[in-house]
A protein has these predicted regions:
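Extracellular/periplasm-exposed beta-strand and loop segments of Gram-negative cell-envelope proteins
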Residues: 239-245, 286-290, 523-527
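Aromatic- and glycine-enriched pocket-lining scaffold segments that form the walls
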Residues: 250-301
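Outer-membrane beta-barrel proteins
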Residues: 174-188, 242-245, 346-348, 473-476
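Compositionally biased linear targeting/interaction segments
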Residues: 20-193, 197, 201, 206-210, ...
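Bacterial Sec-dependent N-terminal signal peptides
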Residues: 1-23
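Outer membrane beta-barrel
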Residues: 183-239, 243-272, 369-370, 374-377, ...
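Surface-exposed loop/turn segments flanking beta-strands in extracellular/periplasmic regions
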Residues: 224-234, 277-288, 517-520
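Exposed, low-structure sequence patches enriched in small/polar residues
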Residues: 152, 249-251, 293, 298, ...
Length: 580
């Protein structure tokens, strides 16, 4: 036994020395979204924010529309920054940015990876930035083998052309695992024109539409995890261009907005089914086969120095209207206290939804937030959260209680649920961090309790880093997921290796694990069964304009009972990215 312990200690030491510096991209995305775990992020939102990391927003040159559509700032912060820029000129340091009303040092540290202080007034920066041309091209492919004799593959390609801040055009095609033939099964594309003189934009193709707090319209998935104060208030981006491989979460059609004094008018027409049009032969005629719908809508916003009021309306134009919603929202910042709310009404279902919340700084190192929700026959809820930062310790705590008017099960008369979570991060020394997350879910139906405990030990120094995760979950049964990860990153090359095992006997006990992948590919598998998995990820910048990303993984199930044995599965991914 002593020899085994010695071997384990030696292997762990060697593993530490061969580890790589942990990438900060996912940490930056987690921070700006206000979530604590990457497993809570939507893949579409990850892809959007990762693109901002690759191409930070040049806030000194950005228009009001660009600042708002980034989704990084509240309306108060946008107005405050534009007012500061008009009075004092361009912001030349992050310390100066933190001094702008609504921008604290804490907030600036969160958004710093996503913004740039590029200035045409500085030496070496061209004055004709508004006419500069940028090209982005990404090509990816993957091969997967599972059941003997069964092999699957996929691919994707996307391209974007951007001319200053006047024109942006993007297109993408992709084929998913399981799709028949070699032809792409998903298409996406869009063109955006901006006229800064008239404070107007036109978008054709795939676009995003996000207004208020999302009760009437917010395409894509919203972060519903209320585990930190930053996640409570949604920062509506209005209309913005979509650039993803599939465009499955985007709206498709025509949209535009224009600024008139303190008002911003946005109008759009979404056409679900437009991408599904097929050409078929009927007798001797060749006719299109489609099931196309038309969903027009608009948003009218009145904006002031400290916030905004807006009204959103959307409906589906058919003989029998299947959808029609109207909402009114407000968001204001009064002496550092954010107050916001939205009320919407579904004219078809005759249901209302109301939410109201606030977040504020209690004292140095402590911020609190609360949110009330009344969703007609769906749920009534109240949530409270706090974030603390004291010396070497920081974290969050939250409680979210919900009551469901319609019972979730015929076996109970009262449906109540309460979720609590506590996160603690301790910076032991400069290169060693300990993280712990404890969450509990109590409900009156189904499995009454769900307890999740996770700890992470993170080591990072120079070009070396390592992470050890230990996760145990108790619901119907008890499940475990553990892994060790390390790699190397220096100059133009980075390599990450991970080895883990899992024991999950019930689907209700599944544990999601974030896996490193290439840009635009968000990988969060649900661990289920009894097995081992190994992954290796590499990123290589082979030229000033080109990068190669590679990922290989293998999952086996050697610990499964004989009657449930299943074969392992292997996957290989390659992706080239060119920027010129």
């Amino acid at each position: 036994m002593r020899r085994v312990k010695m071997i384990v200690a030696i292997l762990f030491s060697v593993w530490i020395e061969c580890a790589a510096q942990q990438s900060l991209e996912i940490e930056s995305i987690l921070s700006v979204l206000g979530v604590t775990d990457p497993e809570e992020i939507d893949s579409y939102e990850y892809e959007r924010l990762y693109d901002l990391l690759e191409h930070p927003l040049k806030i000194n040159l950005a228009s009001q529309s660009e600042l708002s559509s980034s989704g990084l700032f509240s309306r108060y912060q946008v107005a405050s920054f534009l007012d500061y820029r008009s009075r004092n000129g361009e912001v030349l340091s992050y310390m100066e940015l933190a001094a702008v009303d609504g921008f604290t040092e804490e907030f600036v540290s969160l958004v710093r990876p996503f913004v740039s202080l590029y200035s045409i007034g500085l030496p070496g920066h061209p004055e004709k930035y508004h006419r500069s041309v940028r090209n982005d091209l990404a090509v990816k492919g993957a091969f997967k083998s599972g059941i003997p004799g069964e092999k699957e593959w996929n691919y994707g390609l996307k391209y974007r052309l951007k001319v200053g801040n006047m024109l942006s055009a993007a297109a993408a095609v992709s084929k998913a695992y399981g799709a028949e033939g070699a032809s792409p099964d998903a298409f996406a594309g869009s063109v955006m024109l901006e006229a800064r003189k008239f404070r107007g934009r036109i978008l054709v193709g795939d676009y995003n539409a996000r207004f208020g707090q999302g009760l009437a319209l917010w395409n894509g998935s919203m972060i519903n995890s209320l585990t930190s104060p930053s996640a409570f208030m949604k920062k509506a981006s209005g209309l913005s261009q979509s650039w993803s491989y599939t465009g499955s979460s985007a709206l498709t059609g025509v949209a535009g907005d224009i600024g008139l004094g303190q008002f911003v008018l946005s109008a759009f027409v979404d056409m679900p089914g437009l991408k599904d049009i097929k050409i078929k032969q009927y007798g001797g005629d060749i006719l299109p086969d489609f099931n196309l719908a038309v969903r027009p809508g608009f948003n009218v916003a009145w904006q002031s120095r400290f916030g905004q009021l807006s009204v959103t309306h959307i409906m589906q134009a058919e003989r029998v209207v299947p959808e029609m919603k109207t909402s009114a929202d407000v968001a204001y910042c009064i002496r550092g206290v954010n107050i916001y709310g939205e009320a919407s009404y579904d004219w078809v279902g005759r249901q209302y939804q109301i939410l109201s919340g606030t977040d504020f700084r209690v004292c140095e190192g402590l911020r609190m937030a609360s949110l009330l929700r009344f969703y007609s026959d769906d749920l009534y809820g109240i949530a409270v959260s706090g974030a603390y930062d004291v010396k070497a310790h920081k974290g969050t705590f939250s409680v979210d209680t919900e009551y469901y008017p319609v019972p979730k099960s015929k076996d109970v008369d009262l449906s109540l649920q309460c979720k609590g979570q506590f996160n603690w991060e301790w910076q032991i020394i400069d290169c060693l961090t300990f993280k712990m997350r404890v969450s509990e879910r109590l409900r009156t139906w189904g499995v009454n309790t769900r307890t999740d405990i996770r700890t992470d030990f993170c080591y990072a120094k120079d070009c070396i880093s390592a992470t050890a995760r230990f996760n145990v979950l108790r619901c119907r049964g008890t499940s475990f997921v553990n892994y060790l990860e390390g790699g190397y990153k220096r100059n133009n090359l980075s390599v990450y290796a991970r080895q883990g095992f899992f024991i999950v006997d019930n689907w209700d006990d599944r544990i999601y694990v974030y896996e490193r992948d290439a840009p635009g590919s968000f990988n969060v598998p649900a661990m289920y069964g009894r097995g081992l998995w190994t992954s290796l990820v590499m990123a290589w910048r082979f030229a000033s304009v080109g990068r190669l990303y590679a990922r290989t993984s293998y999952t086996s199930y050697p610990f499964m009972p004989e009657e449930k044995k299943k074969p392992g599965k292997a996957e290989l991914k390659l992706q080239f990215v060119f920027r010129f």
